[in-house]
Amino acid sequence: LIVQGQSPDFILLNNDLTDGGLEGLSAGSVLPSPKMGWYQRKKSQHFDFLRPLIEEISELIGIEPWHLICDSFVSEEKCLEKEACRIKLAEEVDVFLAHLSERYARLGVDRDPVVYVKNNRGTYGLGIMTVTSGEQLLNLSNRKMKKLMYGKGTTDVEDFLIQEGVPTLMKTEAGDPVEPVVYLVDGDASSWFYRVNPKKDEIGNLNSPSAHFVSSEEDPSFMTHAHNWHALLSELSMLAMGLEYAAL
């Protein structure tokens, strides 16, 4: 790769590579590695590597792993334009919701379960839907159906990650939901900022155009759990990414 007649020593990659690798990039001089592009990764694979790490650390500190990682499963080969695929996906979602309800009853969690239905590939936030029953998937409007099926790079989605919805407990003084975003350097949680979305509730997808971002310096109150639970989870996730990378 030549830039203005020179070969760069280092390239910071700000492209999720959903559409495929970029010609001329050498993994040795690029971070993050182009090998980790979404053209060959799946969200479910990350959780497959993360879950054993969560289980190990949970045993060490004496808590149930569910407190650190939500439940999920993958529904594959679902062309939602076909009624049979929509019916099958709805049935799978209802079975999963029933499983979550049983767990909540056992643990004394006083709320009804919610699940996210999302593309198993890529980072695009448009095709994420929150549902509380399989019937909602059967009654989708054409517009919502197209959103759910649309992937970044105009690729249709056929593999869906069905993920337990976890309420966002962090709030601003005005009551807007807040979620942390962590930067890591050499595997250590090093810096934080926070996504705030006044147009969403505690169970909604905060990654939408109505979101704005607040640095930890602007509101130090958000940092209450930064150096313990948030740091622990982000560093475990980075370890899982390392295992993903090694497996590619």
Q: Language-model segments: which ranges?
A:
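Short acidic-hydrophobic, aromatic-tinged amphipathic segments that line or gate anion-handling sites
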Residues: 1, 130-131
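Conserved N-proximal alpha/beta basic substrate-recognition cap immediately N-terminal to
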Residues: 1-111
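Short acidic loop-to-beta-strand element that houses the catalytic metal-binding Asp/Glu
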Residues: 2-4, 180-183, 237
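Phosphate-binding site of ATP-dependent enzymes
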Residues: 11, 95-101, 107-114, 121-126, ...
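Short acidic (Asp/Glu) and glycine-rich catalytic loops that position anionic groups and cofactors
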Residues: 28-33, 75-76, 119-121, 212-218
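A general structural signal for short secondary-structure boundary/capping elements
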Residues: 56-61, 76-77, 81, 162-163, ...
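Amphipathic, soluble alpha/beta structural segments
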Residues: 59, 65-66, 83, 174-176, ...
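C-terminal active-site "lid" helix and adjoining low-complexity regulatory extension at the edge
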Residues: 188, 195-248
